[in-house]
Amino acid sequence: MEDRYGREIRSFRLSITPKCNLKCFYCHKEGRNEEHGKLMSADEIVKIVKSSLEFGVRKIKISGGEPLLRTDLPKIIENIKDDQIKDISLTTNGILLEKYAQKLKDAGLDRVNVSLDTLDPVQYKKITAGGNIESVKKGIEKAIEVGLTPLKVNFLAMDCTVKQLPAIMDYCRKIGAILQIIEFIPMEPELKHHHIDVIPIEKEIAKKADQVFTRKFMQNRKKYVIDGLEVEFVRPMDNTEFCGHCTRIRLTYDGYLKPCLLRDDNLVDVANPVRNGEDIRKYFIKCIEEREPFCKAQ
């Protein structure tokens, strides 16, 4: 199904918990800055995902908080697995990944994205308020070993991390990971000074790239291949290409369909309808009707 701007709905991002075992100073909590209602159960999440398939969803992204804190995560993955779904992936901080990688693979998870903004143990501990970078590296190694690939490393480009980019690129090249360079969205005024313009970084990568591809169903974003390393950029701020080609809807952990990453004023309650046994297709239609590009071309 397309929205009124001609954008197909292909991807569904599920935030399954607000809880996390790290306290990164920049966390935007999937656009939900305060804890709200009741956590969705595994069965409720599965019902909602199954209903989404009718509207063209073919890719599922699971996130949090930290999704590995939910002990029923393998059950969720196993039960949403469907012949119509081409890809089920997970975004994690990687702290618990070594422990759960095999279980996730066995349940039907296809691949993982792991957040890693620095290779400096001291800086990592500071950014995450106590995290152990060695646990993350071991988790990445285990994920690759069990076949949760292609693994992506999510690098958040900020004033305090950008100097780490060359080392991160070398690391990703060495382990065979894809590098995703993400523009920082400051959700609080006091964090604005950490934002940097990633366009010059992308231009520099583009100059050195051996190959360039366009990902049609991922906001028309470019993929660059440079000395064997695949690099992608995620630039949501003031980006008409990102918004104009968005194919994703979201589910909050407390059961609201979220038409737009950058808005929190047009959520559609689907938790209560699913708990009441209603046909929830009309709520997906409402969500899709609410979709409009946050940044529009002039």
From Swiss-Prot:
Binding site for [4Fe-4S] cluster 1: C20, C24, C27
Protein EC: 4.1.99.22
Binding-site list for GTP: R13, K61, T91, K152, R248, I249, R250
Presence of the UniProt keyword Mitochondrion in the record: no
Cofactor note: Binds 2 [4Fe-4S] clusters. Binds 1 [4Fe-4S] cluster coordinated with 3 cysteines and an exchangeable S-adenosyl-L-methionine and 1 [4Fe-4S] cluster coordinated with 3 cysteines and the GTP-derived substrate.
Any GO BP annotation: Mo-molybdopterin cofactor biosynthetic process
Residues annotated to bind S-adenosyl-L-methionine: Y26, G65, S115
Pathway(s) where this gene product acts: Cofactor biosynthesis; molybdopterin biosynthesis
Domain spans labelled Radical SAM core: 4-227
Known cofactor(s): [4Fe-4S] cluster
Chemical reaction(s) catalysed: GTP + AH2 + S-adenosyl-L-methionine = (8S)-3',8-cyclo-7,8-dihydroguanosine 5'-triphosphate + 5'-deoxyadenosine + L-methionine + A + H(+)
Keywords, comma-separated and alphabetical: 4Fe-4S, GTP-binding, Iron, Iron-sulfur, Lyase, Metal-binding, Molybdenum cofactor biosynthesis, Nucleotide-binding, S-adenosyl-L-methionine
One Pfam family of this chain: Mob_synth_C
Residues annotated to bind [4Fe-4S] cluster 2: C243, C246, C260
GO MF annotation terms: 4 iron, 4 sulfur cluster binding; cyclic pyranopterin monophosphate synthase activity; GTP 3',8'-cyclase activity; GTP binding; metal ion binding; S-adenosyl-L-methionine binding
Function field: Catalyzes the cyclization of GTP to (8S)-3',8-cyclo-7,8-dihydroguanosine 5'-triphosphate.
UniProt family annotation: Belongs to the radical SAM superfamily. MoaA family.
Official protein name in the record: Probable GTP 3',8-cyclase
Organism: Methanococcus maripaludis (strain C6 / ATCC BAA-1332)
